[in-house]
Amino acid sequence: MAAAVSAKLVKELRDKTGAGMMDCKKALAATEGDANKAVEWLRQKGIASAEKKSGRTAAEGAIGSYIHTGARVGVLVEVNCETDFVARGDMFQSLLRDVSMQVAACPNVEYVTTDEIPNEIREREKAIEMGRDDLEGKPEQMKEKIVEGRIGKRLKELALMEQPFIKDSSITVADLVKQTAGKIGENVKVRRFTRYTLGEGIEVEENDFAAEVASMQNAG
């Protein structure tokens, strides 16, 4: 049994269905490592992938918002689905809230997916990594491989869909979206988001406290 439910099988099932890692492990354990039966098991549980639905147009949906405690961080998120009926449903609205909270909790995230990250940013990150002192003297091929791994990690840090879900770190936001799509039976897509932080971008003048006190004394 342990040999059948290998990490490789879990990864293959996860890639195929979009289900979370723990769900894939449970499915494979329940079906004695049979990948096809595991897919059916996930479908019966309502957590199979929306793979077949992903090509359909998601033009409906809703814009969600989240204001963090203290009103210092605010978020707007657009999530799309196929029908207005689904957009009004509890499951879709729950996803909308969760994604909004996720954006609020991830200040470094700037893009929905890694595919959206511009080439100039990729090239900039590569130039930075190639210049690291710890790579000095290493063979070029090895250096390229190390840099590629570091860049991949860095780009994932910038993408919302790659983040561990704040309520269940065993899955990513992408997994959450796929699971929700599988349950509601429609294509679901996070289209865009905006994160506002109070005072961001405002240059605050730093006063010289000692000079300020001295000037007050002189004025007195």
Curated annotation (Swiss-Prot):
<dbReference type="InterPro" id="IPR009060">
    <property type="entry name" value="UBA-like_sf"/>
</dbReference>
<dbReference type="InterPro" id="IPR036402">
    <property type="entry name" value="EF-Ts_dimer_sf"/>
</dbReference>
<keyword id="KW-0963">Cytoplasm</keyword>
<dbReference type="InterPro" id="IPR014039">
    <property type="entry name" value="Transl_elong_EFTs/EF1B_dimer"/>
</dbReference>
<feature type="region of interest" description="Involved in Mg(2+) ion dislocation from EF-Tu">
    <location>
        <begin position="83"/>
        <end position="86"/>
    </location>
</feature>
<keyword id="KW-0251">Elongation factor</keyword>
<dbReference type="InterPro" id="IPR018101">
    <property type="entry name" value="Transl_elong_Ts_CS"/>
</dbReference>
<keyword id="KW-0648">Protein biosynthesis</keyword>
<comment type="function">
    <text>Associates with the EF-Tu.GDP complex and induces the exchange of GDP to GTP. It remains bound to the aminoacyl-tRNA.EF-Tu.GTP complex up to the GTP hydrolysis stage on the ribosome.</text>
</comment>
<dbReference type="GO" id="GO:0005737">
    <property type="term" value="C:cytoplasm"/>
</dbReference>
<protein>
    <recommendedName>
        <fullName>Elongation factor Ts</fullName>
    </recommendedName>
</protein>
<dbReference type="InterPro" id="IPR001816">
    <property type="entry name" value="Transl_elong_EFTs/EF1B"/>
</dbReference>
<dbReference type="Pfam" id="PF00889">
    <property type="entry name" value="EF_TS"/>
</dbReference>
<dbReference type="GO" id="GO:0003746">
    <property type="term" value="F:translation elongation factor activity"/>
</dbReference>
<comment type="similarity">
    <text>Belongs to the EF-Ts family.</text>
</comment>
